[in-house]
Amino acid sequence: MTRVIVISNLRLAQAFVDYMATHHVALEIRPDAQGVEIWLADDEQLSAVQHELEQFLLDPLNPRYQAASWQAGNVNSNLPYQRFSYLQTLRSQAGPLTLSVMVLCIAIYILMLITGDMAVMSWLAWPYNSSQYLQIWRWVSHAFLHFSLLHILFNLMWWWYLGGQMEKRLGTSKLLVLTIVSAVFSGWGQSLFSGANFGGLSGVVYALMGYVWLTGERAPERGISLPRGLMAFSVLWLIAGYFDILGLSIANAAHVSGLIIGLLMAFWDTRNSARTVQ
């Protein structure tokens, strides 16, 4: 059997299982510390299940899934559903590093609102010159700077979604390494074009996108994935940044550098899995 995914919401998991049953695919639900696991009995059906799962994750509340539950007769099942508050959901889908970085980014953002951007950047921004190179925290701390509410909300949403599942499934140390490496290289890449006047977690976020997506493609048994539709949207967003379509100040070099780092790290980490499949 193959584990397909872990879902925190039992109702959604049951809806997907019922929907796949209408396609003559047998899936099994098992309890998990983070919610429930969905397992597939017939490995030959894995590609079809993954394709349908991508569509499901993009629109899990689509009426066709509820209709499948009615058809299967599981709408009033005796499964022990549990209601979660938003805070419980936030915590259940993230590990200590994911949550700590979120708190740190929010605290720094509030500090920047109180003291001004430059006061905080003077301590945390990418090194301005060689005299600051030995202030090694600067090679990473620039990623925690955000300059607008939309900026920080967008980055933290992706950080929680991608970093949370990576930390839960692969461990805190793996997320820590990717965060540090991508922060350093994305910061270096952006500094070549804009000097030290930049900040934000987006370089790390794009590294996570690349890592989670490619790992899901090459080693789905590791339990992390990013639907191809979301990955395509992220790449289109990256390309749009170069054409200044939205009139926003976007750290394009940091995005590209982060994405490349994430893809390279995922390729390296999954080389044995890909070799086994071949």
Swiss-Prot record:
Keywords: Cell inner membrane, Cell membrane, Hydrolase, Membrane, Protease, Serine protease, Transmembrane, Transmembrane helix. Its EC number is 3.4.21.105. It is an enzyme of class 3 (hydrolase). One of its GO terms (cellular component) is plasma membrane. The chain crosses the membrane at residues 94-114, 143-163, 175-195, 196-216, 224-241, 245-267. It is found in: Cell inner membrane. Pfam families: Rhomboid, Rhomboid_N. It comes from the Bacteria. One of its GO terms (biological process) is proteolysis. One of its GO terms (molecular function) is serine-type endopeptidase activity. It is a multi-pass membrane protein. Gene3D superfamilies: 3.30.70.2350, Rhomboid-like. The active site is at S202, H255. It catalyses: Cleaves type-1 transmembrane domains using a catalytic dyad composed of serine and histidine that are contributed by different transmembrane domains. Rhomboid-type serine protease that catalyzes intramembrane proteolysis. Belongs to the peptidase S54 family. This is Rhomboid protease GlpG. It comes from Yersinia pseudotuberculosis serotype O:1b (strain IP 31758).
